Structure formats: structure tokens, C-alpha cells
A protein has these predicted regions:
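Histidine-anchored nucleotide/phosphate-binding helix
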Residues: 28-40
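Short internal beta-strands
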Residues: 47-53
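Short, structural beta-strand-to-alpha-helix junction motif
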Residues: 187-189
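Conserved small/polar residues in nucleotide/adenosyl-binding loops
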Residues: 193-198
Length: 198
């Protein structure tokens, strides 16, 4: 049986971005749940979350959440008494911006210098350890449980015809309200200026 991997990119490197950190600090279990669901869907038994070492609270909460999930039988062998086994490891990024690129991130998880690989082959064919891999960011994984609970039509009812759902943005700078805002895809800057006017 060929090994497959599920990888989460929690290494947001854009200046002023803290969307991933907020999710990982506030509700790390939602990402673990989504990764296990993804693992089940593709037949993977191992996942990795790649997170910035500069996010010590996120790292600590992820470590606690992974331990709790293992204790409750939500990660590990024979989840819910089935033949499905899936576990998640945590890998800390060293702050290299290039590791936000998916192939560089996988190279870093493998223990090598985080440098991009030529494509093709694409990660779905030859990704982590040269095995089929799905890689998504924190926000994408965090959406999965909500879509399963509320249905695809619910998610598709937000956004535009070509870009469904919502997007989280970090608002900063010389504005009235800083922080995170989740808005439907396709929302124009004019639509949310009331959030940001000084």
C-alpha cells in the first residue's frame, strides 16, 4: 500500500498576516479534525502541520490539542474503533519566507533546506517524501468541518459565482478597527470601508 500524506501550511510569512496564528491559537482542534477527515478521504495515515516557530502560543496549543486528540482516540490507531489510523506531527519553520511555497515547505519537513522543487511532478503525485500529498493552508482546513456540518450549498451561498465562501483578512495600519475580518469572497474594498475608516 502506497503511503500518502496530509500537510497543513501554518507558515504565513506575509508581513502583518496573523490569520493562521489566530485559528491555531483559538481552535487548533478544528484543523486536526479537518486533517483527519482529509486523511480518511485520501487514505493517508500521517499528517504534518508546519507552523512558524515565532508563534509560541500556537505551537503550545497545537501540542496540547494533538495530545488531547490522541488521548480521546481522535488521532492514532483505529480511530472510533475502525480500521482507520491517522496521526499528526508538528514541524516548526525557521522563518524562511520561501517555505510558504508548498514544495519548499515539504522539503523542510523532510529535514532538508527549504528550497522549491521543479514541477511537475506535482505534490499530489510526488510530494512529501516523494509520496502523494495534499497540502492546504490553515484557513482551508478550518472550513472543512463547517462545510460538512452545514452542507456544500451553505458554503456556496456565500461569495461569487466563481469564488465561493468567505475569506479572512488581517486589517492593520492607520485604521479605526484592526484585527481579523471574515467577508464573502468578491467583497470589494468599498464594501468594508466602514470597518476601517479612522
Amino acid at each position: 500500500r502506497d503511503r500518502k500524506y496530509v500537510v497543513c501550511n501554518g507558515d504565513e510569512g506575509d508581513p502583518g498576516a496573523f490569520m493562521d496564528r489566530s485559528v491555531l491559537e483559538g481552535d487548533p482542534h478544528v484543523v486536526l479534525e479537518a486533517m483527519a477527515i482529509a486523511g480518511y478521504a485520501i487514505g493517508a495515515t500521517q499528517g504534518y502541520i508546519y507552523v512558524r516557530a515565532e508563534y509560541p502560543i500556537a505551537v503550545e496549543r497545537l501540542e496540547i490539542a494533538i495530545k488531547q486528540a490522541r488521548e480521546y482516540g481522535l488521532l492514532g490507531n483505529n480511530i472510533f474503533g475502525t480500521d482507520f489510523s491517522f496521526d499528526i506531527g508538528l514541524r516548526l519553520g525557521a522563518g524562511a519566507f520561501v517555505c510558504g511555497e508548498e514544495t519548499a515547505l515539504m522539503t523542510s519537513i523532510e529535514g532538508n533546506r527549504g528550497e522549491p522543487r521543479p514541477r511537475p511532478p506535482f505534490p499530489a503525485e510526488k510530494g512529501l517524501f516523494q509520496k502523494p500529498t495534499i497540502l492546504n493552508n490553515v484557513e482551508t482546513y478550518a472550513n472543512i468541518p463547517q462545510i460538512i456540518l452545514n452542507g456544500a450549498d451553505w458554503f456556496a451561498s456565500m461569495g461569487t459565482e466563481k469564488s465561493k465562501g468567505t475569506k479572512v483578512f488581517a486589517l492593520g495600519g492607520k485604521i479605526k478597527n484592526t484585527g481579523l475580518v471574515e467577508i464573502p469572497m468578491g467583497t470589494t474594498p468599498v464594501s468594508y470601508t466602514h470597518l476601517t475608516l479612522p
